[in-house]
Amino acid sequence: MSDEQTKYSPSIAELARDWYHIPVLSTIILVMLWIRLRSYDAFIREGTVFFSGNDAWYHLRQVEYTVRNWPATMPFDPWTEFPFGRTAGQFGTIYDQLVATAALVVGLGSPSSDLVAKSLLVAPAVFGALTVIPTYLIGKRLGGRLGGLFGAVILMLLPGTFLQRGLVGFADHNIVEPFFMGFAVLAIMIALTVADREKPVWELVAARDLDALREPLKWSVLAGVATAIYMWSWPPGILLVGIFGLFLVLKMASDYVRGRSPEHTAFVGAISMTVTGLLMFIPIEEPGFGVTDFGFLQPLFSLGVALGAVFLAALARWWESNDVDERYYPAVVGGTMLVGIVLFSLVLPSVFDSIARNFLRTVGFSAGAATRTISEAQPFLAANVLQSNGQTAVGRIMSEYGFTFFTGALAAVWLVAKPLVKGGNSRKIGYAVGSLALIGVLFLIPALPAGIGSALGVEPSLVSLTIVTALIVGAVMQADYESERLFVLVWAAIITSAAFTQVRFNYYLAVVVAVMNAYLLREALGIDFVGLANVERFDDISYGQVAAVVIAVLLILTPVLIIPIQLGNGGVSQTAMQASQTGPGTVTQWDGSLTWMQNNTPAEGEFGGESNRMEYYGTYEYTDDFDYPDGAYGVMSWWDYGHWITVLGERIPNANPFQGGATEAANYLLAEDEQQAESVLTSMGDDGEGDQTRYVMVDWQMASTDAKFSAPTVFYDESNISRSDFYNPMFRLQEQGEQTTVAAASSLKDQRYYESLMVRLYAYHGSAREASPIVVDWEERTSADGSTTFRVTPSDGQAVRTFDNMSAAEEYVANDPTSQIGGIGTFPEERVSALEHYRLVKSSNSSALRSGSYQRSLISEGNTYGLQPQALVPNNPAWVKTFERVPGATVDGSGAPANTTVTARVQMRDLTTGTNFTYTQQAQTDADGEFTMTLPYSTTGYDEYGPDNGYTNVSVRAAGGYAFTGPTSVTGNSTIVSYQAENVAVDEGLVNGAEDGTVQVTLERNEQELDLPGDSSSEDSSSEDGTSDGSQTNESASTSTSASVDASAVSAAA
């Protein structure tokens, strides 16, 4: 090497100093990827790929479609939300296109379904790891390379929502959102900085001076493209446009007040948002203004922000040319915005209401009751979540971020305060100190914002947010803030608000926390004692300086992120390594039932023998009400399970995790009789197509008050009812010295719970159920402040009492207002009548007893009422039960006494679980002794029907024929008179509607001599009114027998 080459060749030390961040960042990415892929094998079960959650399954459908139609995404999907269909909305986005492209590349243009599924399986881990790149780059701009790497390390170690959404298997679009938002924020920051440096103004634009405008124009266009790509991944990403718009107002008003031209910032806003708006016209799917779908809202709102930037710049020019006092400019800007909002609300009220509602439930701490039934949409510090986890608010934050949230908040405070205090202006310093004091008061005295909120009728958190926002605006108007830092501050504030409004947005907040800590590290290194901010040579660094930095970093990172710690009563925190263990979850318990449905029910379009099979991956054009062919049908379940039904069952759910059909599903599943359920179905669709719903799937969680049962009560709107109409909490207290604690808690169910359709299906399989002589007793207690009353088990410890007969139980309840019959387990308060058009056709192989949550629920209920949990387990507690809605076989009966009760019974055999149950239905005879029934269970003809001819291959079959019994009476002294018809066959074709006709049943009168000592039989048979004309009917005898069995089970367990 020549001397000249040696002279200009960089040394190893120089290379390390210039490029050390590359290997460090690469290592961080690899570690993040490894952590996120550790559970890969858990998602491959017997060669089948599973995913966790619900939305990932619909992304699988979208990716499969895009692979078949690359690069197009599905424009409309009739395979969900029967009988309407819907657009994919925030599914079928650039995320699905990227995954499909990867699968096509790896599969050499023809990937197998297994490869497509595995590509989607690992996608969240890849995007989660790659999010560290924009995080580092933003952190580098705020805190230098060392700060950027510190932020990257924090992101790597976070164990909370950001990690969970980026784990293998959680293939929702969530984790791709912060990835693309990060790059959009970065591009906007660069564009703003370039504009501050190059200073583009109107004169340069008018003169078309491209040389002067080239750099700000280039970066503004890139910022617009990056923002559009972010919204292509998630249409509600319009939030970032709103954040940028808010920044533009603050920055341009501040610049003008402080004597700078607002046109530099306006240039970035106008160009970038125009580009974003134009690009957002490309993916429009439906001509509407919905926030969650690709419609007109995204492009028009973006163009509105661009136009607003131009207007504010023009207003500033007019202000200056007319020599108006610049101090009034911000007030006029604020007034103009207010007038614009009012006009918008008047001209387009529905659009305004939609935007305002979504804004408040996203960042305004105002998520509604229906939204809060979604676990990921609950407030981050929701009281019920903290209580159930035994956590404090600080403990909850610590479990998610460790100390990094608090150090990030400190960085944000310093970012606001630094420009105020650095000039030594006492007024500005006083403002900063006063603002911090006020924020501290709001935090330490929550009753203050609560009182203001109560007076104004708004959430206390929204009051605090408004006050803090006003303080930040005041600070911005008084000091000089770098454009990109002010933008980051506004972005951080809104994202923090969103994360505390809905817990899911913590996967965004993780990036904010990381970059704010990057900024904090740089500021800390610049403290005189440390003095490392501008060090160029390692020789200039002392051991004391290094030790100070290392100790500070370890204090931030070690608790929670590196070493788990105890968080109050909420248990021990988890590190990222510990929290990365995951699996597919409940879907594996549904898979068998959905596979059965795919193979044993008619294909869509072929029900009843029709020949209109729907193409599963077909291309369907947008419509607001899809015209389904004859033979298509819906499958009703709670909306959580809709995507599983679509993808794993290849059937069309009525409701889905888009919450489409959620209200109708709630009204149907909680219907108190078949007539109400039928009216719900016929109300769906203009021509009542909802009546073509053929199957209902119910799992144990839907029927459990400790799981999902409460969710439909929030959506239900058929009448004004609430959760308390179905069940109420019951507590068992325990005295420990002078302290009283809750030893156990469960629920006491009302009759309305047992009469809801989904409970009648899951618990009783549509059969009638008699009340049992079991009484639950309680005491009323009042809370310490006297505002609430609640139920506790009696102080003598006996919460459940059993009686020999119903009369005795009813007499006890009549004399004790704090007691009721039944209300625990599957024991109703009153008789529950049979369903006529629903039959169990399949139980899952898996039992609910495999669920830890189900077991804990049984144990808790048993402990509350002093019972063994076994007494509360229903017959056949399968995880999932599938029912068919059938016309039913009509029975025309005769031969019974007039105006009496006839009971039909048949024993059914569940071929999957190997258990038996008896279906029972009763009917009243007329004056001629005739009766009519509609029976949903058949006894013969199973082999003649199946999916090949448009019907169901049922997995629940009769063990014999029906038995029909009329009243039993004792006449004279020794003759028993009964009416019976045994082993009556009901053909499958009559039940499923394939055949016309009725079942004719004639009850035969039987007499049998009863040989009893003495003449007491006639007295025993007398009714309460003194008659002996057969008043002791078979119905009452059946009730007595059933009651004694139930009562003995509970009594033995007590």
Curated annotation (Swiss-Prot):
Claim: Aminoacyl-tRNA synthetase is one of the keywords in the record: no
UniProt short sequence motif TIXE motif, positions renumbered to this chain: 373-376
Compartments, as annotated in UniProt: Cell membrane
Acidic residues bias: start-end ranges: 1009-1027
Cofactors demanded by this protein: Mg(2+); Mn(2+)
Binding-site list for a glycophospholipid: H173, R504
Site, as annotated: Important for catalytic activity: R165
Entry EC number(s): 2.4.99.21
Pfam families reported in the protein's UniProt record: AglB_core-like, AglB_L1, STT3
Bilayer topology: Multi-pass membrane protein
Motif segment (DKi motif): 701-712
Pathway: Cell surface structure biogenesis; S-layer biogenesis; Protein modification; protein glycosylation
Sequence motif DXD motif 1, location on chain: 53-55
Highest rank taxon of the organism: Archaea
Regions of this protein lying in the Extracellular compartment: 36-118, 163-174, 233-237, 285-295, 353-396, 566-1054
GO biological process: protein glycosylation; S-layer organization
Domain notes: Despite low primary sequence conservation between eukaryotic catalytic subunits and bacterial and archaeal single subunit OSTs (ssOST), structural comparison revealed several common motifs at spatially equivalent positions, like the DXD motif 1 on the external loop 1 and the DXD motif 2 on the external loop 2 involved in binding of the metal ion cofactor and the carboxamide group of the acceptor asparagine, the conserved Glu residue of the TIXE/SVSE motif on the external loop 5 involved in catalysis, as well as the WWDYG and the DK/MI motifs in the globular domain that define the binding pocket for the +2 Ser/Thr of the acceptor sequon.
Family, as annotated: Belongs to the STT3 family.
Protein name listed in UniProt: Dolichyl-monophosphooligosaccharide--protein glycotransferase AglB
UniProt organism field: Haloferax volcanii (strain ATCC 29605 / DSM 3757 / JCM 8879 / NBRC 14742 / NCIMB 2012 / VKM B-1768 / DS2) (Halobacterium volcanii)
Gene behind this protein: aglB
